[in-house]
Amino acid sequence: MEKSKGYVSERELREGLIKLDNALDKFILMAIYNRIVGKSGMSDLINLKKKDVDFKNHFIKVGKWQVPMDKNFEKITKEAIEQEYYYLEVNSSYVAEGYNLNNDSEYVLRTRPKSRNKNGTAPLNYDGLRNKVRGLCAKAGLELNVSQLETSGIINKMLKKKSDWTVLDVELWLRINNIKVNAYRIYTIIKDING
């Protein structure tokens, strides 16, 4: 498959995740790719709680629906929940700089403990997450925004079903799966990928 602007395959996403140091950061990008975003300002991702993750049945509960986890997504999710130290960067002396996370937080996404965020137990805010995603995509070598990352995940699921999609097929599949995105845009990206 050729690379289409504004799209990454699952393989390309995994290659990008290797460049990230923190399981929490990998989880953020994987969650968006798997449509854990929300209607307004990534609210589903921001408010995702540890109790919403069901490792026994391999899914994440998001509102009224369940997001299945493959082995890789499940591994990253488990590592993100268990992560205790957040690495900012490794300096020139190969000393890792960062901070301890507050694992008493009920949220999967935890912030740097400060008084303004209840010592790291309050949920991340939208602006903070949006800026983080922008930086993570750049570090991972993915030239995407949140919408493009989410759309890439949708397209990846569709291409696993079949490769020859018509606009009507796309519209029907999106409607059946209750996904509200521009069908023609999805169709043109699939057409571009298939050459």
Give the ranges of each region predicted by the language model:
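Short, flexible/disordered intra-domain loops and linkers
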Residues: 114-124, 162-168
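Short, charged phosphate-coordinating catalytic segments
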Residues: 30-57
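Basic, alpha-helical nucleic-acid-contacting "clamp/cap" segments
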Residues: 61-113
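Alpha-helix N-cap/helix-initiation sites
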Residues: 21, 39-42, 126, 143-151
